[in-house]
Amino acid sequence: MAKVKSIIGCEISTNEIRAVELTKENGFYKILAMGYMPLEEGVVEEGFIRDADRFNTAITQLISSGNFQSTDFAVAVNNENVLMRFASFPKVDADKLRNMVLLQAQEFIPIPIQEMEVDYVVAGETKDDDDTPQTNVMLIAARRQMLEGYINIFTASKLQIQDIDSSLLAYCRGINEICNGVKYGIVNITDDVLNYIVVQGNEISMVRSITIPERSQKSVAKVFANSRDGSFEQEDLEATISFLMQETSSTISYYAMQNNIPIEKIYFIANTSANEKIVSELQENIYIPIEIPQFYPSLQSTSVTPLGEYASCIGVAISSLEG
């Protein structure tokens, strides 16, 4: 009997590596291994792996202690070096769209395009003011230097990166399975970026990414640095919530002015121990229902570990297995 292919989906943050090894048997996904490994300060900064030796030690320990078997990885990226922009282009044949998007991408991306790897997903169709058909796309641009660093360091560790994908898109794919077709928004915060996206089915109607501003950086960083034991100061959590409240309220207001169909539900995603408190306080000031998504219920039924913090890892692993 041929060996069943598996792949490890992983996400790298400033403070830790999270990973899930996934396979597909008889049409169903199965978790083979799952775990995380803390990273020492300075190993990963601003999305870049700064200390390859210590990173290699950490990921080797994770693979060993978690009984991971595969050497193939799909990596989810979610930091300030990944830019997402919503754009519209005149509708053309599918085989011409890619060239059009890549030729005009610089108009939407505020960093020299030669420094970025650019991809896109089709986000629906509409018409402009002149009733001309338009194709909406979500542009995804990641710094080439960061991506090449990941590939080179994994290769030096005798690991192969088979795919690199956006964590935010991985979240969308997971939520599409549980949202019952409603128009939903995602609020996703990490230690260096705040993401918003509005989705219904396969149509994306807004995307916004904000680098955590200097006034909030220290508080947000402390909340995430101590996310597992909750040892952050209450004032840092309150400052983080205040920042989230301000940006989320303004984003919802802007979206409502630009769109006729309202957001029906908001999903809050963050890898902190304070998610429930954050959602509770946001809900006091935001009229749209907010909840923490319960990702992959069929997989959760076979796991004693909550899967929320591993959702991006699972999402990129599934995408890679599906090819």
Q: Where are these predicted regions, by residue range?
A:
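Hydrophobic/aromatic-enriched cytosolic interaction surfaces used to assemble or bind macromolecules
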Residues: 1-323
